[in-house]
């Protein structure tokens, strides 16, 4: 108030508006703290980004993701395991060779194929764990579980590692968030994945979109029969 007495009417008005904004921000912070009823995940300390810690890091990232959804900090998240040329060794599965090296072995190499199957089964178990965590977490402010209102999209950037083929890339959808029908396998007949991404956009309510990425691959619209 002392400062306001030395200001012009115009500057006094600006000061009052700024003060009101700060007070409103304080009220929102207090309300946010009062509404903060979601549990904070308990994460093990001292976990560093090392190959052997990958299983623990996976579970920790999953807990952070579920907690972020539960608190409505975000509604979209990406969970990525290694990268396209990742050199992880799944030693906890008894496999010493690096996954990327194994992925370039020919299909006739039965030992490599068995190990890759074991590795992919581990990835699947981590996605299943994410789905289970969402399924056992009630939807905040709604009905059912968070999985009922979420869709997990699990995919890979290649259809086959040793040839770097982009054909027959697998896409798995888990959950009911987009309204897609579950419990089915769909052979899309080799159509560009742009059309699937367009289907996802439509499932999120963006039905005004007619293309996703290169328009040359979207002329036939979204893939039919998913919902």
Language-model features and meaning:
Residues 1-227:
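Ligand-binding pockets and gating/stacking loops
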